[in-house]
Each structure stands twice: as structure tokens, then as C-alpha cells.
Amino acid sequence: KPSTRLTRSVASPIERDIETDLVGPPTRWFGGGDYQTDISTFTKGIEDSGIGKFQYILFDDCNMTGIEVAYELRNVTNHIIGSPTEIMAYGMPYKLLWGELSKVNPDYHRICNDFINFYSNYTYKGSSYPYGTISVIDCSQVENMVNLMKDINRSASLSPFVESNLQSMDGYNPSKFYDMGDYVRTILHNDPLLLARFNQQLNLLVPEKGNTSSYYTTFNKDSFGHVVPIRTYSGITISDPSSNPEVRQSLNKNLYYKATH
């Protein structure tokens, strides 16, 4: 996993916050601190295996459809399926999705629709928790977006942004992951031509996505969790605007950041 993200392990899925008094539903992560891997290691393992490029990689985990992840995986998979926010511990509703996931050429639009329909009606211990986000990233479009982001970051007409006004996609404080579309549209407020190029490329990079009106997070909140409204949603996150110390201190290891700055 890129250094801007908390390292996740590759062990079996368990409910997070199991030792706390969380009353609301837990969200999904994997294992603990003993066995971990980075996205770069995962990528190298795929490359060294000689099995070729995957049709898709599905992440049944939190905060995995970020531009940083897509950049590192761009050469080992055609698509990435996952959630830009936390996902409930129930995870992907495989019974509903398997009909498409098992195909050589899945219908990604249907996968997103079925996922959102499931989580729009999700309940936990008899209470309604209608929260979910999903997106599909086309990795063949990552290089084009990276080249465009180089131009954007070098632009002399970038508008200032207020971090707290951006669409946060997590419960960290300060946030680590922001909606990429919201961030770039904010800084390109005074450059309509460059913004038009970005919007066009974003639509190619994230061809399918879905979201409920809010997302749910268990981080740094009360025992019932916390619901965050989604006012804008591009289906992909970026950590560039984050002032979180963990993000800022790891930029020298962030391959996407180094490629675009």
C-alpha cells in the first residue's frame, strides 16, 4: 500500500474496533500489525509471478480506490474495483456480484449498481446503515492522468484551497484522503480550459462509480460511528492536499506524488 495509507495486512478479515465499545457496525480491515505488505510489494509479486495482467483487482477493504494505488498497480491490472471510503465489515456482497465478477469481461456498471442497491438497504443489528461507495478505475488511463496532473501542478494559475472545505473521504483528523475531483476542480477554478481537460480524463479514468448520499466512518468519533455527507463524488481519492503528518512525512516514498511534482 502507498506510504500515504496506513499499512494493511494480508491476514484474514476481522472486525476492527473489536476491543472498543463501538455500538454501530464495524468497518472492514484485515488482520493486525504482525503481517503486512505494501502495494509496491504486491505489485512486484504479480510481476515476478509471470501470470500477466489481471482483468481486475478487487479490494474488499477501506480507502483503496486512490490515485496513488492506481499508479502503482497500473501495469499489473486492467481495472481496480474498490471503495474510496471505509466499507462495512460485511464487505462486498459477493452473492450478488459473483455473476459479473466471474465473467471474462464483467459489466462494471452492473457491479456498481448492485453494490449500491445492497448497501442502500443495509442493516446492522436491526438498525439501518445505508452507506456505501464503490468505483472502478481503468488503469489504462492512469498514465494520461498522471501526465495531466504534472501540467496542473506546474500551472501558474492555480487557485488556493481550504483543506477543511474539500470533500473528505475518511474519518482521520486531519483527513488523509480527499475526493480527487473536488480538489482539482477547486484549484483549477480560474483555468476553465485545463479544468475541461481534467474532467474529460477523470471520466475515462473512473468509468463507473456509485455512492449513497453519505458514508460511514468509525475513526475518531463516538461509539455509534459517524456519518459524513457526500456533496461531490468522483470515485477516486488523492492525498496531495492533506496536512496529516503521516501523509506529509511519507511523500518521499509516494511514487505518484514524485511522478507529478
Regions found by a protein language model. Name each.
Residues 2-261:
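Terminal, contiguous helix-loop blocks that mediate binding/assembly
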